[in-house]
């Protein structure tokens, strides 16, 4: 009988833990990802748009983790354009901000200027986030056009080409 309060307390704790466990959410979750085919379609469309404008570029689509999913470099695009395109996509997805906007927000003596010194950050236009159903699912990076704005326009053309495949 002396252990009755202890046993009662143990039962209450066990019951509480069981109830909490029953209400706990799963330890996993589902995420949206671009298919490789959709990523390649966006890359091709951006490359074609830049070609029509007379630009030789590299284009990369990165997934939601910033890992390259699809990549193309046109014949005469400089060797630096490959890593720059990937890093523009990485910067856009990492900071959830298109790089043209990011470049303005981190320029000069702003409090965020130091972020430009982080590895892989490319604070010039040409990195644009890709969203589906309100969720960022990746980003496209373009490098090699004569201006950041031109890189950005080609990236947006790549996204426009896959718009029907994304949930908006």
Predicted region positions:
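Bacterial N-terminal signal peptides that target proteins for export
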Residues: 1-10
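Flexible, solvent-exposed loop/hinge segments and secondary-structure transition points
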Residues: 23-168
């Amino acid at each position: 009988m002396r252990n009755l309060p202890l046993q009662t307390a143990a039962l209450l704790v066990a019951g509480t833990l069981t109830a909490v466990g029953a209400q706990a959410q799963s330890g996993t979750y589902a995420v949206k990802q671009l298919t490789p085919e959709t990523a390649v379609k966006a890359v091709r469309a951006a490359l074609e748009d830049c070609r029509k404008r007379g630009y030789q570029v590299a284009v990369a689509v990165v997934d939601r983790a910033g890992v390259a999913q699809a990549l193309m470099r046109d014949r005469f695009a400089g060797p630096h354009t490959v890593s720059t395109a990937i890093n523009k996509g990485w910067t856009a997805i990492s900071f959830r901000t298109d790089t043209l906007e990011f470049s303005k927000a981190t320029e000069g003596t702003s409090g965020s200027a130091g972020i430009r010194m982080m590895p892989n950050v490319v604070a010039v236009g040409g990195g644009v986030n890709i969203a589906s159903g309100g969720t960022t699912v990746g980003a496209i990076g373009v490098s090699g056009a004569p201006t950041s704005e031109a890189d950005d326009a080609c990236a947006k053309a790549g996204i426009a080409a896959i718009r029907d495949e994304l949930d908006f």
